[in-house]
From Swiss-Prot:
Principal localisation: membrane
Organism: Bacillus subtilis (strain 168)
Cell location: Cell membrane
Keyword Transmembrane among record annotations: yes
Gene: ywcD
GO terms, biological process: polysaccharide biosynthetic process
Membrane topology category: Multi-pass membrane protein
Matches recorded under InterPro entries: GtrA_CellWall_Glycosyl, GtrA_DPMS_TM
A GO CC term assigned to this protein in UniProt: plasma membrane
PANTHER family: CELL WALL TEICHOIC ACID GLYCOSYLATION PROTEIN GTCA, PROPHAGE BACTOPRENOL-LINKED GLUCOSE TRANSLOCASE HOMOLOG
Protein name: Uncharacterized membrane protein YwcD
Keyword terms, alphabetized: Cell membrane, Membrane, Transmembrane, Transmembrane helix
Pfam families: GtrA_DPMS_TM
Length: 127
């Protein structure tokens, strides 16, 4: 299920980036950050509901989980933006192609971080 939701999240990221850069003429760095925000929101919802099937029973737990998810994903933003600056800024790679390449790395980083840091099961949940 993670792969399916990861594909959808990647599509959200690349499509929003493409629209911002190619249609709205937004700078690729700003578009990278905006696409990251949209895709992280999408990823949180789909990971919570469909991948890790986490149930949150109170607002405090939800906010803690959401904060952890976004905090961990800041690492992916750094990787995303860094790769875009290197690929586009240094190697003159097409912006959309660079976004596709960097998403391949981001999917792996995000899965590991989500599984082990955000949606980890506690002893009470059977682990």
């Amino acid at each position: 299920m993670y792969i399916i939701m990861g594909v959808f999240t990647t599509i959200v990221n690349i499509a929003s980036f493409y629209i911002l850069v190619e249609i709205m003429n937004v700078d690729y760095k700003a578009a990278t950050v905006a696409a990251w925000i949209l895709s992280v929101l999408f990823a949180y919802i789909t990971n919570k509901l469909y991948v890790f099937q986490q149930k949150t029973h109170d607002l405090q737990s939800l906010l803690k989980e959401l904060t952890a998810f976004f905090s961990v994903r800041v690492l992916s933003l750094g990787i995303d933006l860094g790769m875009m600056i290197i690929l586009v800024g240094q190697f003159n790679t097409n912006e959309t192609l660079a976004k596709i390449l960097d998403n391949a790395v981001i999917v792996v980083v995000n899965y590991v971080a989500s599984k082990w840091l955000v949606f980890k099961k506690t002893k009470e949940e059977g682990v």
